[in-house]
Amino acid sequence: MKKLLSVLLAVIFAACSLSLVSAEPKATDPTREPGVGMNVSNFNTVDLDGNTVTGDILQNADLTFINYWATWCGPCRSEMPHIQAMHEYYSSTPEADVQFIGVISEGNGCTPATAKEFLQNNGYTWVNLRADSVLRSVLNTSGYIPQTIIVGRDGVVRDHLIGGFTSQNELRNFIEMWHDAMTIHANET
């Protein structure tokens, strides 16, 4: 009986292992999120001072880097010095045509007031917004932060990542890759 039970367990284990090996791979990279291809140019929200900001802001640059973050999020806080450095670099290099926008993830103590205080205390100067339903439909799909979307001047989301950037070089390479790709695409049309 013990031998039969052992053989039966071995067969079940082998069948389970084969089903795992032959399973179809997931269609998406786990670091990528849905939303690529969506047009977000119709958002209408406010900045942390209550001033209205619309999707027209996307017209200000060929590439807009939008980062979804919260004050309590460790990975968000870790990547912010890198974002600030890139914001300063691209602000002083207007021909690069890149802008940075933050969108706060409200809740768990992160409010417009606490976000504004955090940004000011740390010298972070890029535009930060509250999420409206349009931005939330892209950024709040997984419940994870930080998230980053790359948006073209036309308002179309080109990329959507979850997780933070761990170095300035990693962030610069990511931005340059997308900037180059969007420049090539613009020149082809």
Kindly give the residue locations of the regions a language model identified:
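Short pre-active-site segment immediately N-terminal to redox-active cysteine/selenocysteine motifs
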Residues: 62-64, 69-72, 107, 144
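Sec-dependent N-terminal signal peptides of Gram-positive bacterial secreted proteins and lipoproteins
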Residues: 3-23
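N-proximal helix/coil linker or "cap" segments that precede and/or mark the start of modular domains
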Residues: 20-42, 59-60, 116-117
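Thiol/disulfide oxidoreductase modules built on the thioredoxin-like
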Residues: 120-125, 130-179
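A short beta-strand-turn-helix
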Residues: 42-64
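Non-globular targeting/processing and membrane-anchoring segments
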Residues: 16, 181-189
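Hydrophobic beta-strand anchors of alpha/beta hydrolase catalytic cores
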Residues: 65-66, 100, 148
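Structural microenvironment flanking redox-active thiols in thiol-disulfide oxidoreductases
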Residues: 77-122, 132-138
